[in-house]
Amino acid sequence: MLSLKKYLTEGLLQFTILLSLIGVRVDVDTYLTSQLPPLREIILGPSSAYTQTQFHNLRNTLDGYGIHPKSIDLDNYFTARRLLSQVRALDRFQVPTTEVNAWLVHRDPEGSVSGSQPNSGLALESSSGLQDVTGPDNGVRESETEQGFGEDLEDLGAVAPPVSGDLTKEDIDLIDILWRQDIDLGAGREVFDYSHRQKEQDVEKELRDGGEQDTWAGEGAEALARNLLVDGETGESFPAQVPSGEDQTALSLEECLRLLEATCPFGENAEFPADISSITEAVPSESEPPALQNNLLSPLLAGTESPFDLEQQWQDLMSIMEMQAMEVNTSASEILYSAPPGDPLSTNYSLAPNTPINQNVSPHQASLGGCSQDFLLFSPEVESLPVASSSTLLPLAPSNSTSLNSTFGSTNLTGLFFPPQLNGTANDTAGPELPDPLGGLLDEAMLDEISLMDLAIEEGFNPVQASQLEEEFDSDSGLSLDSSHSPSSLSSSEGSSSSSSSSSSSSSSASSSASSSFSEEGAVGYSSDSETLDLEEAEGAVGYQPEYSKFCRMSYQDPAQLSCLPYLEHVGHNHTYNMAPSALDSADLPPPSALKKGSKEKLADFLDKQMSRDEHRARAMKIPFTNDKIINLPVEEFNELLSKYQLSEAQLSLIRDIRRRGKNKMAAQNCRKRKLDTILNLERDVEDLQRDKARLLREKVEFLRSLRQMKQKVQSLYQEVFGRLRDENGRPYSPSQYALQYAGDGSVLLIPRTMADQQARRQERKPKDRRK
């Protein structure tokens, strides 16, 4: 009903509604299920009961297709389409659905026709065989006199339309002939009766809870039915010619592997060099389960496939891949490493101990094949073959092995994203290290993205220079940790450690004051007008203008700020860190004395940039005392200081200007301080007033509450006194005519209501007259 509801036209619905309004009962289910096979043929095509299928010649297109083009079973006869659908479904998890068919072997009863049809022409020959018991409505239909035939015949043959009791002999003979012909062709009740198939599902659910004996019997009968073919002309059953399971298995595995190869092509250096034929020969066909062999049989066999076939095929393919990967791994490990019996690396990991890719980085070997990163998780040692076999790579020195990031600087991205356990930061002299399972993924995904070849040309560094840096500054926590190696490669990872590196690389007080000016952004902290005025003088001493790097942050792209760092001149620019030590150019390295002298000059230039304009002018005029004394000394001491030295007019005028500007600055600071103190005092006064206001509001609320309570008490007292008053006759006074009035001396008078109202009006007018 639900599957065919959308095909009903609007006119049919309107006609049904009209009939229901008139009072005629319309049973739509009978028209949509078993009573209308033509409607189902229009929608789904003719069923197999009416189609003469060529069982012996399915592929012969000269006589027409064996299956109707509109049949829903057409897809099962195309092997390529079925295999493609199975291969595409390998990466999806499918919950298997079990179907259990139970068969009961018994003899048919002699009276196979119900009592309403006494004619013996409809009775079939009773013989022992397999009878489907999936019809749950045997008892119901036998009691219905409208059904002209028994349930036994309905299960074995087609469904006849409901007939009355006045059938002629010709009609009964025609029905008998058609019925026998349908039974001979193999068309049962389930082909025609749609509601019968719906009821079969309910019966199957009940039969699933049965014993194991019925289940095995049902599977055997189903297998027997699948192995039998029915002749279209004679209706005879004969066993099917099943091809050998070995050929079918090998052919299907070849097709699956070929489809996998087309979906995920391997590179030139594939991890699986063996061909497909050798793989299929290595796997014995006898080890295939029966479910897989049944699934790989010819599509001529009918029946439902096992729900575990796809899962079993996927497991077989994965086992083949693992076997071949194990062959490659064992051959590689025999060449590279022969482990002793007690080696923990061989017992725990079964891998050859290779050098991690972070220690021997070669830009030419950083890229992998097209599909290598998918299989890298299964065999990580395959990727390490070209790295471990290359003898031209230079390992790090033991003094620098504690921090590999000092060797590569910003190019070693693994130190920025992964902990030291995965980065391979252990000492090289400690022994063989564990392989890095993420090295290949990082090399292909990260190093290709940042163009490692360009970095090797622009920003490389030398391990020998790193060792000299460590000897120069007597600390491996200063410049060896993420420090800059060239003015153009100052990256964001070095900005966070610039304060620590600058403070630990020198021991003098001037260096500590210089380190305090660094922020986390890596630039100088205080900027004044003296920096812009003295840039030209400083550039002459530096002699180098660094170029901007594509990895440099915007805050680092000031050449004046980069040139003032004292340790940048020791950084060489020889980018051949993959070469041997003999190939290094020693002419680029200055002597240690020149390095120390240059560092002092750089430090002096850096301190010069931190001085103000007046300090630079005082140094240029060679004034013998500091600006602090000029500004902060009292008048008497200042005059004595000037009298001790022989100063020129220009020097005296400069000293007076410095003192005047310093005093003005101090006066301005004092003025700002007084203003701030005044503002703070006003804020405190405002807070005090707000507290007083809140206190007065609370008191007002208390007064109003007490006044309200007093009025209530006076009102109650007034009513009590007025109720006790009596006239001469002993009657109480009326509240509408009389009222009580309080006198100034405390006495209470009883007056008429009109007089009391007049006095109240006069008292109200007095405040108004005063306001005017």
UniProtKB/Swiss-Prot annotation:
Cholesterol recognition/amino acid consensus (CRAC) region as annotated region, ranges: 191-199
GO process annotations (BP): cholesterol metabolic process
Positions marked as site (Cleavage): 103-104
Residue ranges of the motif Nuclear localization signal: 761-768
Region feature Leucine-zipper, mapped onto this chain: 682-696
Basic motif: annotated segments: 656-675
Segments forming domain bZIP: 654-717
Segments traversing the membrane: 7-24
Compositional bias ranges of the Polar residues kind: 113-131
Residue span of motif Destruction motif: 476-480
Residues annotated with Phosphoserine modification: 528, 599
Annotated region described as CPD, given as residue ranges: 379-383
Residue ranges with Basic residues bias: 763-772
Keywords attached to this entry: Activator, Cholesterol metabolism, DNA-binding, Endoplasmic reticulum, Glycoprotein, Lipid metabolism, Lipid-binding, Membrane, Nucleus, Phosphoprotein, Repressor, Signal-anchor, Steroid metabolism, Sterol metabolism, Transcription, Transcription regulation, Transmembrane, Transmembrane helix, Ubl conjugation
Region Disordered: start-end pairs: 108-148, 470-532, 753-772
Any one GO cellular component localisation term in the record: endoplasmic reticulum membrane
Free-text note on domains in this protein's UniProt record: The cholesterol recognition/amino acid consensus (CRAC) region directly binds cholesterol, as well as campesterol and 27-hydroxycholesterol. Has much lower affinity for epicholesterol.
Family: Belongs to the bZIP family. CNC subfamily.
Self-association state and partner proteins as the record states: Interacts with KEAP1.
Name of this protein: Endoplasmic reticulum membrane sensor NFE2L1
